[in-house]
Each structure stands twice: as structure tokens, then as C-alpha cells.
């Protein structure tokens, strides 16, 4: 199946992790923050990136709305960003996950 959007990719990634156990742990979270903006948390336990570190990446961090930052902590991928940056954060995660070496 062609993955047309970033959200399509994330939904398919989530489904590919579901093994009868993984999905019963702490699942992916997408929330709003009061800046305004988005917060993304994706668990890595049991995935191809389990135990891997992602060096913090920030884009336009001082901008009021057009900013985001992504990092790993406690075996989770995190992103936080402005109100129009959710897809960008998911794309950073997608690039990192699909670049497994």
C-alpha cells in the first residue's frame, strides 16, 4: 500500500509494532501543549529502535509558532513543536526509523 501522508505512515508503523504485547504498554501519544502546539511521544521498547539514541534536533526553536524539537529519553522518541509542526516531527521520526543500519 502506498503511504500517501505522514499520518498514513505513522498509522502503518503503529500497526506493524502491534504483536499482541507491545500495544498493551505505553502506546504512542499525541497531545496539545499550551504554547500552542503539539507534543509527540512514541515508545521504542520492542521496536527496531529499541535502546537507540536520537541526538536532540531543533528547528527554529526561538520562533513563536514555526518551531520544533525532537529527542529520545527513557527509550521513547519525543517531539514538541508549534501548531503546524506535527507532521514535521513525525517526518523526523519516520526518517530516523527508516534509516536503520
Task: Give, region by region, the residue ranges found by the protein language model.
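Acidic, glycine-rich loop-and-strand cores that form catalytic or ligand-binding grooves
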Residues: 1
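Eukaryotic low-complexity, non-globular regulatory regions
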Residues: 4-6, 11-21, 77-78, 85, ...
Amino acid at each position: 500500500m502506498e503511504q500517501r501522508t505522514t499520518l498514513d505512515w505513522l498509522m502503518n508503523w503503529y500497526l506493524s509494532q502491534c504483536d499482541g504485547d507491545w500495544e498493551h504498554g505505553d502506546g504512542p501519544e499525541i497531545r496539545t501543549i499550551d504554547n500552542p502546539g503539539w507534543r509527540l511521544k512514541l515508545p521504542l521498547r520492542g521496536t527496531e529502535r529499541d535502546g537507540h539514541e536520537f541526538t536532540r534536533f531543533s528547528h527554529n526553536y526561538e520562533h513563536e509558532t514555526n518551531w520544533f524539537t525532537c529527542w529520545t529519553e527513557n527509550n521513547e522518541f519525543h517531539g514538541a513543536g508549534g501548531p503546524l509542526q506535527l507532521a514535521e516531527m513525525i517526518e523526523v521520526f519516520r526518517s530516523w526509523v527508516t534509516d536503520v543500519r
